[in-house]
Amino acid sequence: MKFNELKSFPVECRQSSMGCAKDCERKWLCQYRLGIKLRGGEYKEAATLGQIYHRLQCLGPGHEVEVRAEVRKQQTALMAGVERGEDLDGNMSRLASNLTMLYQKAEVMAHVFWKKFPQPEYFTTLGMEIKHSVEWQDGLFITGTLDKLLILSPSYDAWIRDHKSTGRPLSALFGGLSWSLQGRIYRILAEDYIRTVVGSMNNPVKGFILDGIITPGIKLCKADEKNAKEWKCSVETAYLRRVEEWYVSYEVKAEFDNKANTKALDSKAMLFTEPLYP
């Protein structure tokens, strides 16, 4: 296919495309308007860790085996690409070799978060990882993925819940929560999804819950094997215990240093008080 034969995709207003356009307009044109992607793969450790963590959070406790199987399947697909000669810059083999480590870290992050912020029983899950698109003015599409859509009992109000992991202080996540663009876009998507897909007019979207957790700076290593023998537990349990201690020490050190945000994980809710449309 020749370059002049490519057909452009409709403009989508979504977080990833807007971020790409801000960083590099040429990449945005190729990837999001023309559908051109580089052969091979990109090595983005934080993004891959976040994807695995998101998957664990969406499925919830008890589904670790399922997510682990998905990671193994991804590893197999990456190595198959390497054998076909698609690994032009070595990123595919690098990612495949590090996926196990990233899964181990994501799993302990999820367990630490579930322990401190379990989902309340008065919430029921209407949907998970909901991909939805709304056609806006002049052919503009608002698109996004809702991590979770929850129904509050007994009022039947709907709440959006989003999970984020970061290497920065949580103040970078929660600082602009009340006026964030993401919360407004997700509100539009959630209301349209409930009305057009669920077919309900009795579940008004009341608010946005944002969960944040800082990525731990340690990974499973020989120290956990040594601790497992000493504590008479599995290596995974020893690693979980060491990560829990890391989170405690992070918050203690942040408080000692008089930092503005001393928390390593948090969950905050924003109630929608303004009408969606003027």
Protein language model features and the residues they cover:
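A non-catalytic, helix-rich entry segment at domain boundaries
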Residues: 52-130, 135
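Hydrophobic (often cysteine-bearing) scaffold residues that line and stabilize catalytic clefts
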Residues: 45, 49, 102, 106, ...
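Short, solvent-exposed loop/turn segments at secondary-structure junctions
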Residues: 35, 133, 166-168, 214-217
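Nuclease catalytic cores
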Residues: 11, 15-65, 129
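Metal-dependent nuclease catalytic regions and adjoining charged, substrate-binding loops involved
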Residues: 13, 188-278
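Residue-level recognition of the N-termini of beta-strands and the immediately preceding loop/turn
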Residues: 124-126, 158, 203-208
